[in-house]
Swiss-Prot record:
Pathway: Amino-acid degradation; L-histidine degradation into L-glutamate; N-formimidoyl-L-glutamate from L-histidine: step 3/3
Role of this protein: Catalyzes the hydrolytic cleavage of the carbon-nitrogen bond in imidazolone-5-propanoate to yield N-formimidoyl-L-glutamate. It is the third step in the universal histidine degradation pathway.
Lineage, opening ranks: Bacteria, Bacillati, Bacillota, Bacilli, Bacillales
Gene Ontology molecular function, alphabetical: imidazolonepropionase activity; iron ion binding; zinc ion binding
Binding annotation for Zn(2+): 85, 87, 255, 329
Binding site for N-formimidoyl-L-glutamate: 157, 331, 333
EC top class, as a word: hydrolase
The protein's name in its UniProt record: Imidazolonepropionase
Family statement drawn from the similarity comment of this UniProt entry: Belongs to the metallo-dependent hydrolases superfamily. HutI family.
CDD domains given in the database record: Imidazolone-5PH
EC number: 3.5.2.7
Catalysed transformations (reactions): 4-imidazolone-5-propanoate + H2O = N-formimidoyl-L-glutamate
Keywords: Cytoplasm, Histidine metabolism, Hydrolase, Iron, Metal-binding, Zinc
Ligand binding (Fe(3+)): 85, 87, 255, 329
The encoding gene: hutI
Length: 424
């Protein structure tokens, strides 16, 4: 039987309490519900008690000898970080495109000439299930070392029914085998494959009539995503795909307004999407409609940074009442990173967000963006015992001392999975 874990004397225990019922918006994104000299008791995989060290020492005075005690003196304790937008399961690498972009090629130029998503699609189609599992597990291990305990994972590098199912089956197997929880998204509409270049509507029909029903039948995904962008899928095609997903029980998400304004934010609001992601070029009208419809903005500053583009205006979105989450967009072409803490720092430096806001965006709002805020995203009694401990005294220092992995300890479902910065 696993011993209880008792975290004691945290310099700051950032609980993020109070935001489980609905996404956190506006000024409340700066409210972290911090407990100084904080303490938390984890048992049977869930959080049993949260408070000051004095409170827990009194409450558990007869059980102290039972617990594995972690001294968090001088450290920041937060909920396990949550990454709500990744392309985790893929094969291959695209470092050659990095040099092409440095020499002036754009993302869409590379893609339209057979690179980009098409390059990764070819590698992923060629990879076996076992090869995809092994490569993706390595990424998950790195996520864990950077404090992440839950990730969303998209398909979208298969673009055939067989290969999309292969990606989703790998994600399912990883979810069962790895400490990190994985929430899967079907994204067969990530790109129009080259074999359908002359007839993209036929591919859209296949996504709607063949892929979505089979993914839903096998219960391999929670969400259905589409890349709504000029040269990829039009707003009309995107609407058809998202509405088809809803008919089969898949919740809508959308890659929106990344390269240019394309009414993606407006479409997200219209179809009641759980989130709209990227939004670098979202219109003011679209932002307002997202706020009214309760669509979460999942912002990906690492992608803009890596593509040398202007970031999404996170400050404007928060000030206009949009709930903002933040993510790595881990993928081989435009954001090959697993460091969510670094992405949080970019949220401050490139999107005008405060250190408190980016922590909210990487925990409770990220949980809402993948519909699991009832289980994770805050340190509250009854939630999963997912905790990250950083070697910094407070949440401000976490963003101030950038480019360093400050993760000391990660606890998943009450089990220590990272200790002293290494996999346990």
């Amino acid at each position: 039987m696993t011993k209880p874990v008792w975290i004691r004397h945290a310099s700051q225990l950032a609980t993020l309490a109070g935001g489980s019922s609905s996404p956190v918006v506006g000024a409340k994104m700066n409210e972290l519900s911090i407990i100084e000299d904080g303490s938390i008791w984890l048992e049977d995989g869930v959080i049993q008690r949260v408070g000051t060290d004095e409170d827990l020492a009194l409450h558990y005075r007869d059980r102290t000898h039972e617990a594995q005690i972690i001294d968090a003196s001088g450290k920041l304790v937060t909920p396990g970080l949550i990454d709500p937008h990744t392309h985790l399961v893929h094969a291959g690498s695209r470092q050659n495109e990095f040099n092409m972009r440095l020499n002036g090629a754009t993302y869409m130029e590379i893609m339209n000439n057979g690179g980009g998503i098409h390059s990764t699609t070819a590698a992923t189609r060629a990879a076996t299930h076992e090869e995809l599992f092994a490569q993706s597990k390595q990424r998950l291990d790195q996520f864990l070392l950077h404090g992440v305990t839950t990730v969303e994972a998209k398909s979208g590098y298969g673009l055939t029914l067989e290969d999309e199912l292969k990606q989703l089956e790998v994600a399912k197997q990883l979810n069962e085998a790895h400490p990190i929880d994985i929430v899967s998204t079907f994204m067969g509409a990530h790109a129009v494959p080259r074999e359908y270049k002359e007839n993209p509507d036929a591919f859209v029909d296949m996504v709607i009539e063949e892929m979505i029903p089979e993914v839903a039948r096998r219960k391999l995904a929670v969400f259905n995503d589409v890349f709504c962008e000029r040269g990829v899928f039009t707003p009309e095609q995107s609407r058809r795909i998202l509405e088809a997903g809803v008919r089969h029980g898949l919740l809508p998400k959308i890659h929106a307004d990344e390269i240019e304004p394309y009414e993606g934010a407006e479409l997200a609001a219209s179809v009641g999407a759980v989130s709209a992601d990227h939004l670098l070029r979202a219109s003011d009208k679209g932002i307002e409609q997202m706020a009214e419809a309760g669509v979460i903005a999942v912002l990906l500053p690492g992608t803009a940074f890596f593509l040398m583009a202007e970031s999404a205006n996170g400050r404007k979105m928060i000030d206009r009442g949009v709930a903002v989450a933040i993510s790595t967009d881990c993928n081989p072409g435009s954001s090959p990173t697993v460091s969510l803490p670094l992405i949080m720092n970019l949220g401050c430096l490139k999107m005008g967000m405060t250190p408190a806001e980016v922590l909210t965006a990487a925990t409770i709002n990220a949980a809402h963006a993948i519909r699991c805020a009832h289980e994770v995203g805050s340190l509250e009694v009854g939630k999963k015992a997912d905790v990250t401990i950083f070697d910094v005294p407070d949440f401000m220092t976490l963003q101030y001392r950038y480019g360093i992995n400050h993760v000391n300890t990660v606890i998943k479902n009450g089990t220590i999975v990272v200790a002293e910065g290494r996999l346990a």
